[in-house]
Amino acid sequence: MSFVVVAKFPCKPGQVDAMGELFEAALSDTRGFACCERIDVVLNEPSGTYLLVEYWDQESSYDTYLQWRTDTGIAEVLAPLIEGGGDRILGSVDSLGIMQDI
């Protein structure tokens, strides 16, 4: 069963397209990261908010990925584009848990 993570990124006014371009570039690396099963990207156009739904083989794989993203400076790249800046980034991520086959 997959470990599911949801990340919500409310864009600053006028930054939706820039965020989409950033995700297009960055998520190819994420999708190629070991043990990433899938990432779905949803844009709520009225609010200018992106929602990423990520599926990993297990929680520790996601933790390894998140550390890599942190170490390579993703927060500094995202900060100018999202409401609340850098302080908002980690607070926008929810590690939901294990997908259930019910």
Regions found by a protein language model. Name each.
Residues 89-102:
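Acidic/histidine-enriched, glycine/proline-rich intrinsically disordered or flexible terminal extensions
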Residues 25, 29-37, 55-90:
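An amphipathic, aromatic/His-enriched active-site/gating alpha helix that lines ligand/cofactor pockets
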Residues 3-9, 38-66:
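Short, well-ordered beta-strand segments in beta-rich or mixed alpha/beta enzyme
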Residues 10-20:
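Short, surface-exposed ligand-recognition loops at beta-strand->loop->(often short) alpha-helix junctions
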Residues 14-16, 46, 60-61, 95:
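Generic "edge-of-domain/loop-turn" microfeature
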